[in-house]
């Protein structure tokens, strides 16, 4: 199923990003300086690639169709699980950006802690979240959606990926 294959491939990129975020946190803990611009680049990737591009496809296409077609099990899984975790990731990214801005004005230990806390929290959240999607959500969709619904997911995913703004953002990252 093309739509899910793309999402799984994007997960691989996001996992690598999460490794980089944790490495950045370790570097700060080991006494290296905080690079606020690097932190802001991480936020840009998180908001653009992981959230807008990847979560956008999930929320606007796959999850939407699952909610329409697969009943209360999908409703609980998507609304009470995946969407809540997407929102938690957004919170971490917003808090991380605010911490980087504060650190530039006041390079205190507290602001450094907020950078580490939100970067590591985001990476941990996304790694666990990706496991749930790959092992539970996507397999449920592949098993339970009709052939027609799978074709709809694939077609809408291709259209999303062909959007010029989305193509430009994928090329950027």
Describe each model-derived feature in a short phrase.
Residues 1-173:
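Small-residue-biased structural context
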């Amino acid at each position: 199923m093309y739509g899910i294959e793309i999402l799984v491939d994007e997960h691989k990129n996001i996992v690598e990003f999460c490794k980089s975020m944790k490495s950045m946190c370790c570097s700060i803990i080991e006494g290296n300086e905080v690079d606020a611009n690097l932190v802001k680049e991480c936020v840009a990737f998180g908001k653009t690639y992981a959230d807008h591009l990847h979560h956008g496809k999930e929320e606007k296409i796959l999850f939407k169709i699952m909610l329409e077609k697969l009943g209360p099990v999908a409703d609980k899984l998507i609304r009470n699980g995946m969407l809540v975790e997407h929102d938690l990731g957004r919170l971490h990214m917003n808090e991380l950006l605010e911490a980087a801005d504060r650190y530039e004005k006041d390079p205190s230990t507290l602001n450094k802690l907020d950078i580490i806390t939100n970067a590591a929290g985001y990476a941990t959240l996304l790694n666990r979240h990706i496991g749930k999607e790959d092992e539970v959500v996507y397999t449920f969709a592949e098993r339970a959606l009709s052939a027609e619904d799978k074709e709809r997911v694939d077609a809408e995913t291709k259209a999303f990926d062909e959007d010029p703004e989305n193509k430009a953002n994928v090329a950027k990252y």
